[in-house]
Amino acid sequence: IAMAPAGGWVAVRGSIDLPMVVLCAAVALWIGAFDAMYGAQDEDFDRSQGLHSLAVSYGAGGAFAISRVLHVTCIACFFALGLMLGLSWLYFVGVGIGAGTLYYQHSIVSPTDFSRVTQVYFLRNGIVSVAICLCAWLSYYV
């Protein structure tokens, strides 16, 4: 999934540039973060099957801590991307909405309560992607 922006970038621009790498890094970090969070609920199963997931290696709490670091780094990459591309203030509003949504994700799911993990995984990540994409697109017209 993180390589999809690279394909679009190269198709449109015909080059591999630093902003494209930062965009791909942001997406990879974002995906890795929510995968760590979602996968933490499988700690017992992963352990019983001899899998080497983050939850097995670091516990559910550790997987959540890693997820937080990845989400913060992801938002930093999206912010840096906006600066590199000279996007307008509206793009940064989208990044702010994304950051707030990711913060909210971490506030409603914990290593001991996965009851809302599906809501986080599908609905909240959809909000992040739509907010950043829509605001990036609109920033070209404002």
Report the location of each language-model feature.
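Multi-pass alpha-helical membrane architecture of UbiA-family
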Residues: 1-142
